[in-house]
């Protein structure tokens, strides 16, 4: 694996000079192999090690390099044709392979090669970009978008129109992460490498980036870039120091544990916030 990483790191330093016509065989094969490993879930751009999320920057570099080594080409779809550098994940799938891998794909859901989809996942008409990881039992609902290299945990529900941001540029940014057993309400956006920790519930229409204040009304604490585990979050506003205006924020209205979540429906958690 170290040899593979070295090839990617070296190629990335001269990425501006790489084209589909001049890329050498070793570099092309290394990039293609990494994309295949991401596609099968053997590698992932970020993983939790000793309780902390670690981003493997060299894998993100490989994803970026993949755009340098391929020309656009026509791709056939059920309703239309496409013209892009990145092939579709399911282009070579037959019924046996779909059954073997154990997920559902509802037309016209689109997944790019290099994204991993785990068993028992349901993809409604949605979009999953290259480098993303979608774990077991997750629902990606209609018109939801899972951005490049985003990490989606087990038993997550991404509601209709949800946007999970991609972070290939800038390269130093960490991917957006939704941990296990989270619910993200319709039309919400989580971007810029924000981490939504396990068991959290994000209400409809909540927008969270790195600069968004995440206000815990019970403690008065303000978080940036992280929604603590078990949080129930709605959109809100915080006043300026002089009280002359207010600015948008996300508000943690309560905390719940797994036992409470198992007994109480999502809608009930969001209704009882007073």
Swiss-Prot record:
Location in the cell reads: Cytoplasm
Q: Which biological pathway?
A: Amino-acid biosynthesis; L-lysine biosynthesis via DAP pathway; LL-2,6-diaminopimelate from (S)-tetrahydrodipicolinate (succinylase route): step 1/3
Q: Name one GO biological process term.
A: lysine biosynthetic process via diaminopimelate
Superkingdom in the source lineage: Bacteria
List the catalysed reactions.
(S)-2,3,4,5-tetrahydrodipicolinate + succinyl-CoA + H2O = (S)-2-succinylamino-6-oxoheptanedioate + CoA
Predominant subcellular localization, coarse grouping: cytoplasm
Q: Name one GO cellular component term.
A: cytoplasm
PANTHER family tied to this protein: 2,3,4,5-TETRAHYDROPYRIDINE-2,6-DICARBOXYLATE N-SUCCINYLTRANSFERASE, MOLYBDENUM COFACTOR GUANYLYLTRANSFERASE
Name-wise, this protein is 2,3,4,5-tetrahydropyridine-2,6-dicarboxylate N-succinyltransferase
Source organism (scientific name): Yersinia pestis
Identify the gene encoding this protein: dapD
